[in-house]
Amino acid sequence: MSDSPAGSNPRTPESSGSGGGSSSGGGGGKRPAVPAVVSLLPPADPLRQANRLPIRVLKMLSAHTGHLLHPEYLQPLSSTPVSPIELDAKKSPLALLAQTCSQIGKPDPPPSSKLNSVAAAAANGLGSEKDPSRSAPGAASAAAALKQLGDSPAEDKSSFKPYSKGSGGGDSRKDSGSSSVSSTTSSSSSSPGDKAGFRVPSAACPPFPPHGASVSTSSNSSSPGGSRGGSPHHSDCKNGGGGAGELDKKEQEAKPSPEPAAGSRGSGGDSAHGGPEATASGRKSEPPSALVGAGHVAPVSPYKPGHSVFPLPPSSIGYHGSIVGAYAGYPSQFVPGLDPSKSGLVGGQLSGGLGLPPGKPPSSSPLTGASPPSFLQGLCRDPYCLGGYHSASHLGGSSCSTCSAHDPTGPSLKASGYPLVYPGHPLQPAALSSSAAQAALPGHPLYTYGFMLQNEPLPHSCNWVAASGPCDKRFATSEELLSHLRTHTALPGAEKLLAAYPGASSLGSAAAAAAAAASCHLHLPPPAAPGSPGSLSLRSPHTLGLSRYHPYGKSHLSTAGGLAVPSLPTAGPYYSPYALYGQRLASASALGYQ
């Protein structure tokens, strides 16, 4: 710096303290006489050198103004910015990201931080004029903080934890840039002092999680009204009076949420409603388990009981070879009594008639938790098979003993002895056998995929599925198919196992037992003439048999009126219902089933 050019102004303490040297024409305001004279002196003049500051002092003075990215942005930011340069650095996306990352994993603020957060909210009211990125007005936030000091635990400003559950039952942790206590409420049902948790449910309007209470993670850069969202707590509730949606604010503030189990995880709104705050907050949430009222728009979710948004009738109507698609994710109101340890096969009305213990509550779904063993243990390895209980040969008590290999939920019905295991079709008598059930399905609209050709030269295919894969051999007649299936089912000791069950005495021979076992195991259509509807062939995937259940097919009740159901006696080569619910055979593991 000692050899600076002659025209530059020497750095005096006044000029350097103000933030850097000015040009020769502009620096004369502070020293009126000297700069005009000194500017004409050469750089090596002693008078000019005497007025100069040491380089070390200059570096110390200009250290905080030389660069934009100040190291302080890595720390939790204070409520008021220090300088305009630091303010710009704090609003940058990199600074916001670093601030968020530096605060992950910090412990919850102690209870003594309530007063601190109120003071910080008051300071936020002062700083909100300088910083336009504050998401709520400062005075309103301070007033809300003072009002809510006794209601809900106020949040520390430097503890934004996106994954922590709120200690007040659902209060959301705010970003450090947003106000300490949220004034983001529904425009129709409550006012700015509302608790940032769950609305207190009334008798007329079922509760919803407030979407306005979810503050997005980027709320530093949001507009002043950006975090205000209308919560789906509609005021035009159909099942109540005119003002049913208007909840009392005092009641909401006085009571905490009475149903923490119905709340969403974290504090975000229900993501099925797709509010702007719910999608921006990035927090996973579960839909509340309370039933949706008649006036609300239910989110379409297969795991939540609500309005009937699926083309399926109620569970009092039985289905051919299906359990109403519970494994396919239909609402649990169509599958009322599902319990892995009890009978998962009967509808709610039938299980009540049989005196069975009830299953899970109707609000639960078989897919909400982990995969239930009643569906996964008994699954056939055929990719299009959802278990032996989906076969139409089980209707009306026509079954076989080896189906217990598919069905682990059976033994609880063994003592009941009722011949009709499933809720019957309205047109189906209780004494309907398997062949009648097959002949009564001319089109079987559950299987809308593929081509169904009656005049197939080899209509009978072997659907045996072992550990090595499906067999897929084709035969012209059902007798040839059954004789081929005996090669699959011929195991040492199988006849003894089949004869050990009570219904085995009604069989004509062990060959008939093997045929019935093969027909039930492989979901094959029963023996029928090649042109009859029972021998239809599905060409497309794996040439599936008609009694296969497909989870994505349409409901078959559209053609239920045209079904001609003949009444056949139950006597014949079919087992009694006791045989279906015997213990799992030892041959089941040898056959490739689980």
Curated annotation (Swiss-Prot):
Residues 1-14 have a biased composition (Polar residues). Expressed in mammary epithelium. GO terms for biological process: adherens junction assembly; cellular response to estradiol stimulus; mammary gland epithelial cell differentiation; negative regulation of DNA-templated transcription; negative regulation of homotypic cell-cell adhesion; positive regulation of cell migration; positive regulation of cell population proliferation; positive regulation of epithelial to mesenchymal transition. A zinc finger (C2H2-type) spans 460-488. One of its GO terms (cellular component) is nucleus. The modification Omega-N-methylarginine is found at residue 584. Disulfide bonds: none annotated. InterPro entries: Elbow/Noc_ZnFinger, Tscrpt_rep_NocA-like, Znf_C2H2_type. The modification Phosphoserine is found at residue 257. It is found in: Nucleus; Cytoplasm. PROSITE patterns: ZINC_FINGER_C2H2_2. One of its GO terms (molecular function) is zinc ion binding. Keywords: Acetylation, Cytoplasm, Metal-binding, Methylation, Nucleus, Phosphoprotein, Repressor, Transcription, Transcription regulation, Zinc, Zinc-finger. Residues 246-256 have a biased composition (Basic and acidic residues). Belongs to the Elbow/Noc family. Interacts with DCAF7 and PHB2. Interacts with TLE4; increases transcriptional repression. This is Zinc finger protein 703.
